Amino acid sequence: IPIIPKFQERPGDFADLLLIGFDKTHLEDQNHLDRMVHFFLYDYRFERVWKNPDNDIEKLSRYRAVLSPDFSMYLEMAPVMQLYNVFRNRWCGAYWASKGLRVIPTVNWGDESTFDFCFEGIEKGSVVAVSTYMASEHDNRCDQKEWFMAGYNEMLRRIEPEKIICYNTPFPEMQGNIIHVDYERSSWRYMNYERSFHREDLDAFKIGGTSSNNRDTIEPYLIGKGGGSAYGADWKPNPKKPN
């Protein structure tokens, strides 16, 4: 797995830090260049950075820094897909760093079986980024704190990060030098953007006839967004119900 070099901190890098979603970045942006770019998004919104990693370098270089792409690590994923997504995360981050971008590795994990590879490619003492959003209770999703804290504590043990950027409210049990980034202040709601997506960007995620609104789908696509259970740790499909 490629190694993302340690982030070289500059004065003010983490002062009043806000993030901007990759899908809201553009070359003409003059108002949000002091933010770091995050990929805590549905995977289809940034799949292109894996397919064409050079295309967005000029744009990304204008921002304060870039978090490595957070390709999803759902518990329901096959292990080979989890490993593949860790590889893609680190490869993009390492490649961008080699091109002069300031990159902070995003860390995600599945269950304990992923711990042997999901922290690879990150040097000890690095600055890292995590998000509690998908592990927190909201909308139809249940709390997944137990899953999150198991991986978080293992990350502390293996990486010993210098700083941890936490997108969304940290859990009280989280230890370490945490830099809390407010989810709402960083969201598109405060940036006068409209939600949009291109249907052609979803081709890789098409799964056929899916009708449930209780998992991360846009009919008829299964789309990743982070980690934990794709079913929000609560609702699960009825195995007796015909597809």
Label each region the model flagged.
Residues 11, 18, 99, 156, ...:
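Generic alpha-helical secondary structure signal
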Residues 3-6, 12, 199, 221, ...:
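Generic low-complexity segments that are intrinsically disordered, proline-rich and/or Lys/Arg-biased
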Residues 1-57, 77, 158, 193, ...:
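Non-catalytic, usually N-terminal nucleic-acid engagement modules in DNA/RNA processing proteins
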Residues 28, 37, 47-197:
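Eukaryote-skewed repeat-based solenoidal scaffolds used as protein-protein interaction platforms
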Residues 1-9, 176-207, 214:
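C-terminal accessory extensions appended to soluble enzyme cores
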Residues 41-45, 169-170, 210-211, 226:
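Short, flexible beta-strand-to-coil junctions
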